[in-house]
UniProtKB/Swiss-Prot annotation:
Family the UniProt entry places it in: Belongs to the AB hydrolase superfamily. Lipase family.
InterPro entries in the cross-refs: AB_hydrolase_fold (IPR029058), Lipase (IPR013818), Lipase_LIPH (IPR016272), Lipase_N (IPR033906), TAG_lipase (IPR000734)
Cysteine disulfide links: C233-C246, C270-C281, C284-C292, C427-C446
Example of a GO cellular component annotation carried by this entry: extracellular space
Organism: Rattus norvegicus (Rat)
Originating gene: Liph
UniProt key word Lipid metabolism: yes
Membrane topology, as annotated: Peripheral membrane protein
Reactions the enzyme catalyzes: 1-hexadecanoyl-2-(9Z-octadecenoyl)-sn-glycero-3-phosphate + H2O = 2-(9Z-octadecenoyl)-sn-glycero-3-phosphate + hexadecanoate + H(+)
Known EC number: 3.1.1.-
Protein name in UniProt: Lipase member H
Length: 451
């Protein structure tokens, strides 16, 4: 709540409504947020035929909405400035580009715009009732609940849940993008989004320590970077307004990345972020569907597998890069050492591709214990995926400021890609790593016995 309060102090004036040829998202001013707004919901339809010019529709006039097609509703959340969401247009265009569908923007800016968050929160059920009235008319015209998909951002995620509850969980799918936490944390299932609200509920948690919901809410819950501080977002209040909203918005930007085919973000089901970082959760156990779940639009490839689980809920973790397309590429670095005594320390690994590109991973979340003839498997994360690795460097460090410098004697090092398990494993034998000295070498193909 503290971050939410600070957010309000950074609000700046935005432009008021103006007449436009094509209907667009309601644009209000900060003055509207201060004096408050009554609830008014506009439904704006976009199709492949009308991708940039919306058509305002309602329960008595469905317009050009094709009830035989998939219909995706986008529901925004709290708007303390009255301005349109910066991501809305891109999300609409990206959805239409991947599949022929109806995209309906649920514009409840008159209602969500207020500096008093509880006032916006109190209107969520009213918005849900309006959406149910509209969907009832869709069903009367021949639509199927199976083809209804709701993407809810922040408060919008709970609105989607309330709609799903009114249809006894028969909606096709709900995606919650960092569902709002304040006033919803700890509430019973009927007062928030939960897995029973749709046939498939997937959730991305990106700001669990401030504006987002802490606990799992779906059949599968994704936690980028543990669901806390997101790379690329300001770490202090000196980052201005971005400090307060960047982590919260990152769920939307990560979802957008899944629609844009720059890379596929893979997540790893795990009990905790710490276990994931320690490399304990890289086998997903669902090879008959996909090796591991993908974040975002294609997360429902895992729905049948999750339905068979008891309970049908899974947490999945992954890390991201600071900038688009946010992908991190995972490798295992398997090290067998032959020191007489245990060596504890950290490994930094660099890869150089045949094209000259270099990428680095610091495996430093906690020290590893290297014991004689025991294999230590380290999960390394790189911002770049190198198809052909020409050179590898390793650096061993105990991070000790005083005391002797140690050696790590490596009997065998093996590098294997998790994203591309079909790639050949690369090895190197009989290395001596001097502490804090980078050691370069050319890898060779591992023998078949060690694949």
């Amino acid at each position: 709540m503290l971050r939410l309060c600070f957010l309000l102090s950074f609000m700046c004036l935005v432009k008021s409504d103006t007449d436009e040829t094509c209907p667009s998202f309601t644009r209000l001013s900060f003055h509207s947020a201060v004096v408050g707004t009554g609830l008014s919901v506009r439904l704006m339809l976009y199709t492949q035929r009308d991708q940039t010019c919306a058509q305002v529709i309602n329960s008595t006039a469905l317009g050009s909405l094709n009830v035989t097609k998939k219909t995706t509703f986008i529901i925004h959340g709290f708007r303390p400035t009255g301005s349109p969401p910066v991501w809305m247009e891109e999300l609409v265009q990206s959805l239409i580009s991947v599949q022929e569908m109806n995209v309906v923007v649920v514009d409840w800016n008159r209602g969500a715009t207020t500096v008093i968050y509880p006032h916006a929160s109190s209107k969520t059920r009213k918005v849900a009732l309006i959406l149910k009235e509209f969907i009832d008319q869709m069903l009367a015209k021949g639509a199927s609940l199976d083809n209804i998909y709701m993407i809810g951002v922040s408060l919008g995620a709970h609105i989607a849940g309330f709609v799903g509850e009114m249809y006894s969980g028969k909606l096709g799918r709900i995606t919650g993008l960092d569902p709002a936490g304040p006033l919803f944390n700890g509430r019973p299932p009927e007062d928030r989004l939960d897995p029973s609200d749709a046939q498939f509920v997937d959730v991305i948690h990106s700001d669990t320590d401030a504006l987002g919901y802490r606990e799992a809410l779906g059949h599968i819950d994704f936690y980028p970077n543990g669901g806390l501080d997101q790379p690329g977002c300001p770490k202090t209040i000196f980052g201005g307004i971005k400090y307060f909203k960047c982590d919260h918005q990152m769920s939307v930007f990560l979802y957008l990345a899944s629609l844009q085919n720059n890379c596929s973000i893979t997540a790893y089901p795990c009990d905790s972020y710490r276990d994931y970082r320690n490399g304990k959760c890289v086998s997903c156990g669902a090879g008959h569907i996909v090796s591991c779940p993908s974040l975002g639009y294609y997360a429902d490839n895992w729905r049948e597998y999750l339905w068979d689980r008891d309970p049908p809920m899974t947490k999945a973790f992954f890390d991201t890069a600071e900038t688009k397309p946010y992908c991190i590429y995972h490798y295992f670095v398997d090290i067998i050492s032959w020191n007489k005594s245990v060596r504890r320390g950290f490994i930094t690994i660099k890869l150089r591709g045949e094209d000259g590109n270099i990428t680095e991973s610091k495996i430093d979340h906690e020290p590893s214990a290297f014991q004689k003839y025991h294999q230590v498997s380290l999960l390394a994360r790189f911002n770049r995926d190198l198809d052909k690795v020409a050179e590898i460097s390793l650096l061993f460090s105990t991070k000790s400021v005083v005391g002797p410098k140690y050696k790590l004697r490596v009997l065998r090092m093996k590098l294997r890609s998790l994203a591309h398990p079909d790639r050949p494993h690369l090895c190197r034998y009989d290395l001596v790593l001097m502490e804090n000295v980078e050691t370069f070498f050319q890898p060779i193909l591992c023998s078949k016995q060690q694949m």
